[in-house]
Amino acid sequence: MIPKVSLPASRRMITLEVRRREFLTPGFACVTLGGPALRDLIVTGNDQAVRLFFPREGQSALRMPTVANEAWIAQLLVLPKAVRPWVRTLTIRRARPADGEIDIEFAVHGDAPLSNWVRRVRPGDPAGIFDMGTMYRLPEHARGQVLVGDETALPAILSILDGIPPSLPSEVFLEVAAAADIRSFEAPAGSRIHWFSRDDGDPRPGAVVLEAVRRAALPPGPLYAWTAGESRLATGVRRHLVDDRGVPKRDISFFGYWRLGRSTPG
């Protein structure tokens, strides 16, 4: 059975500052965070996730939790909103330990707290992270893989592709909100990249890419699958692979990053 999350041996709350922000496409931005405290981060690559703490609009300082375990949630919730930061889960896109920097990529959309922060952030602004480990686990018996996600899963999938053997047959299905957010990148030799945008088809998040997976010719097995994004996309891909393709449940990692119509509490 593939473990859902692999945590590092030790974790700490890490306070950093914004070094740079760059818009990659109209709907995607990259924020570089840095600082000497990054020496406490154990970089594992793949889909390594962190809790990102960032100030609410109007807060001049960042008040981080002080406990380096899951009790941080209770510690955060007792803070009044006047000093409580926002927190969201993101993937480390790149890590440069020698420079004391990490890059985090964001899908920027609508009037959401995270998107608004990305739009207004400037160098020197505070931010913090807490390591949440990795969930990608390629079994030794896998002879190919399938990666599926919407725009919220794109940074994780790109990071996974950075670390796989170039010869591993990989079918990669990526959905973004608009064609303007499709971008070129250097993929491993064994990977085939399939882009889809919702402005060319069904506007429901995940519907276009899920239908594409159902119609696709996949690599011969045994297969490993990793899928994430809107909750119904992740569960739909898993159900299809298990029921229609015969992929064992233990060889599928799936994660509902968000649910349509439901906001993340803060």
Residue spans for each PLM region:
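Extended, composition-driven regions rather than compact fold-specific motifs
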Residues: 1-266
